[in-house]
Amino acid sequence: MKFALTGGGTGGHLSIAKALAIELEKQGVEAIYLGSTYGQDKEWFENSPLFSERYFFNTQGVVNKSFFKKINSLFLQVKAAFKAKEILKKHQITHTISVGGFSAGPASFASLLNHIPLYIHEQNAIKGSLNRYLSPKAKAVFSSYAFKDKGNHVLTSYPVQNAFFDYARTRAEIKHILFLGGSQGAKAINEFALLNAPKLTKQGIKITHICGSDAHEKMRFFYQELGLLDKIELFAFHNNIIEVMRRADLCVSRAGASSVWELCANGLPTIFIPYPFASNNHQYYNVLEFEKENLCYVVPQNELLPKKLFEVIRKLNQKDDQGNKNLTIISAKLQQKIAKDGAKTIIETILSA
């Protein structure tokens, strides 16, 4: 028995691949990885000991491109699929798991050509174009969101690393706010943090701001100009996001699925700013259920005024009839919404099929 893991491009997809690879290693199952030279795949897995072999193809995404660029991207995908077909055959792969993203294309199609059972993890509440096409052909599609076309869909807990649960805590007071711009940076969140920093620091609230590598120097300059650089924690990115979340009492973040469920597992109340240009507006739908259950606050990017932060803080500090703060209630309920061992459940379901 030997697995191939494929997909990525962004940290959200890759964090799932990592969680599944860790579980395969625990189960004593060998795995190889197939991804792309474009995006973050090599950065995550080029030297990863989780895989016996790693392959990266010259591929790019197809959606949101001009006609001629789409043709070129499709050509690269097809070319890579035939290479992947030979690789899967060479390694005698018995199961393939796709975590989505454009880099999953070649190995997913190669698996179908080689009659290898294909399993898919759909991380978002709205399927990406590749997963929409491949889902009917897959052995099973795992997701933490319920889809109308149930078919071969398996509802499971999101494959979050156990450390997010291990370092979870129930928040009682807002003393520390995390602005999570992500590894790529989010201009709207960076500006939101900057505009609120003077008032927050004056109130004695600590700030940790992860702004992305492209914006780091600019953010350093602006905080320096405000005289706040030595009063806040500013990072381009952070290698230990679990520790950063653990220390925070409130977060401001985009609504990528992995971030949503990691914050949930950690019990960290969050203001989500869905990326407005995400395909099919999937970031909004990723947190729609949370919003309906009063487990988060969602602010559209075009409504992101500085006063919104303090409006949310006031709401979180309000108490119910029993004297419990909304902050504490939400924090506790978040930890109940997601179960541990999502990756383990997925792998064991596949192994027992």
Curated annotation (Swiss-Prot):
Major location (coarse): membrane
Designated gene of the protein: murG
Membrane topology category: Peripheral membrane protein
Organism: Helicobacter pylori (strain P12)
Annotated protein name in UniProt: UDP-N-acetylglucosamine--N-acetylmuramyl-(pentapeptide) pyrophosphoryl-undecaprenol N-acetylglucosamine transferase
Pathway participation: Cell wall biogenesis; peptidoglycan biosynthesis
Coiled-coil blocks: none
Keyword rRNA-binding: no
HAMAP family for this protein: MurG
BP GO annotations: carbohydrate metabolic process; cell division; cell wall organization; lipid glycosylation; peptidoglycan biosynthetic process; regulation of cell shape
Record: residues binding UDP-N-acetyl-alpha-D-glucosamine: T10, G11, G12, N124, S183, Q283
Pfam families linked: Glyco_tran_28_C (PF04101), Glyco_transf_28 (PF03033)
Cellular component GO terms, alphabetical: plasma membrane
Keyword Ribonucleoprotein appears in the UniProt entry: no
Keywords for the protein's UniProt record, in alphabetical order: Cell cycle, Cell division, Cell inner membrane, Cell membrane, Cell shape, Cell wall biogenesis/degradation, Glycosyltransferase, Membrane, Peptidoglycan synthesis, Transferase
Catalytic activity of the protein: di-trans,octa-cis-undecaprenyl diphospho-N-acetyl-alpha-D-muramoyl-L-alanyl-D-glutamyl-meso-2,6-diaminopimeloyl-D-alanyl-D-alanine + UDP-N-acetyl-alpha-D-glucosamine = di-trans,octa-cis-undecaprenyl diphospho-[N-acetyl-alpha-D-glucosaminyl-(1->4)]-N-acetyl-alpha-D-muramoyl-L-alanyl-D-glutamyl-meso-2,6-diaminopimeloyl-D-alanyl-D-alanine + UDP + H(+)
Cellular location(s): Cell inner membrane
Any GO MF annotation of the entry: UDP-N-acetyl-D-glucosamine:N-acetylmuramoyl-L-alanyl-D-glutamyl-meso-2,6-diaminopimelyl-D-alanyl-D-alanine-diphosphoundecaprenol 4-beta-N-acetylglucosaminlytransferase activity
EC number annotated for this UniProt entry: 2.4.1.227
UniProt function note: Cell wall formation. Catalyzes the transfer of a GlcNAc subunit on undecaprenyl-pyrophosphoryl-MurNAc-pentapeptide (lipid intermediate I) to form undecaprenyl-pyrophosphoryl-MurNAc-(pentapeptide)GlcNAc (lipid intermediate II).
Family: Belongs to the glycosyltransferase 28 family. MurG subfamily.
